Curated annotation (Swiss-Prot):
<dbReference type="Pfam" id="PF01790">
    <property type="entry name" value="LGT"/>
</dbReference>
<dbReference type="GO" id="GO:0008961">
    <property type="term" value="F:phosphatidylglycerol-prolipoprotein diacylglyceryl transferase activity"/>
</dbReference>
<dbReference type="GO" id="GO:0042158">
    <property type="term" value="P:lipoprotein biosynthetic process"/>
</dbReference>
<keyword id="KW-1003">Cell membrane</keyword>
<comment type="function">
    <text>Catalyzes the transfer of the diacylglyceryl group from phosphatidylglycerol to the sulfhydryl group of the N-terminal cysteine of a prolipoprotein, the first step in the formation of mature lipoproteins.</text>
</comment>
<feature type="transmembrane region" description="Helical">
    <location>
        <begin position="23"/>
        <end position="43"/>
    </location>
</feature>
<feature type="transmembrane region" description="Helical">
    <location>
        <begin position="247"/>
        <end position="267"/>
    </location>
</feature>
<keyword id="KW-0812">Transmembrane</keyword>
<dbReference type="InterPro" id="IPR001640">
    <property type="entry name" value="Lgt"/>
</dbReference>
<feature type="transmembrane region" description="Helical">
    <location>
        <begin position="189"/>
        <end position="209"/>
    </location>
</feature>
<comment type="pathway">
    <text>Protein modification; lipoprotein biosynthesis (diacylglyceryl transfer).</text>
</comment>
<feature type="transmembrane region" description="Helical">
    <location>
        <begin position="107"/>
        <end position="127"/>
    </location>
</feature>
<dbReference type="GO" id="GO:0005886">
    <property type="term" value="C:plasma membrane"/>
</dbReference>
<keyword id="KW-0472">Membrane</keyword>
<keyword id="KW-0808">Transferase</keyword>
<keyword id="KW-1133">Transmembrane helix</keyword>
<feature type="transmembrane region" description="Helical">
    <location>
        <begin position="133"/>
        <end position="153"/>
    </location>
</feature>
Amino acid sequence: MIETLLPASALAFPAIDPVIFRVGPLAVHWYGLGYVVGILFAWWYGKKLLRSHRLWANNQPPMAPEALDDFVIWAALGVVLGGRIGYVLFYNFSYYISNPLAIPALWDGGMSFHGGILGTTLAMILFARSRGILVWSMFDTIAAGVPIGLGVVRVANFINSELWGRVSDVPWAVYFPNGGPLPRHPSQLYEAFLEGLVLFFVLFVLVWGARKLKQPGFVAGAFVTGYGLSRIAVEFFREPDAQIGYLFGGWLTMGMVLSVPMVLLGLWAMWRANRAAARNA
């Protein structure tokens, strides 16, 4: 029984300070650094893709690499605003409707990846249309590098001892400082592996091996599908948000509900890209 686990059967939580360093009243956290690293990597990697003309249809990238320099600010706003608004709407609406002044308090935590995706998607659409860029290719350019940022942020979640997994007796279960007396799945690291390393590798093969950037929308569809499937899988090991709990049957979570449409949308995007390529062949 899990309730009779001995302390030796699980791992102690590593003593890592969530704050990397302080400069006066300013504290730099691993979580914030994760977002910065994610945005900067997607910017750098996107420029690398745009400089590789052979990856694109007719050897013609959809935009100049320098265009991404301007998009960085748009992306940051999309991630932060979308992530926060998504968390408020999807995960703790009753609290924030009663405490609206707490909504801007990002330093207290509370970001939704699904909301961040919606915010960034809106930013990409507006930016692409303002510059005359094909929207689907804009999606592809950014999506190809996003998994690395996801992986870093999930590691930061682990360091912060948040979003931990369900109680478990697996040998690698961890005693989280604020996770109660029983060991739990380090589900943040599962997500870092699947949403970060594995998904980046899959997209890397699609981009550099299968040359799927020549089919606008395919890489973005693969990213959305891959993330959705990864998130659904990890949700079986992740503790549901305390303020929501299980939505049905002791297994269905909000993360699953929000991920299913992503999988369907991603599959449709890949089908659409293949169909368009077949028509133009």
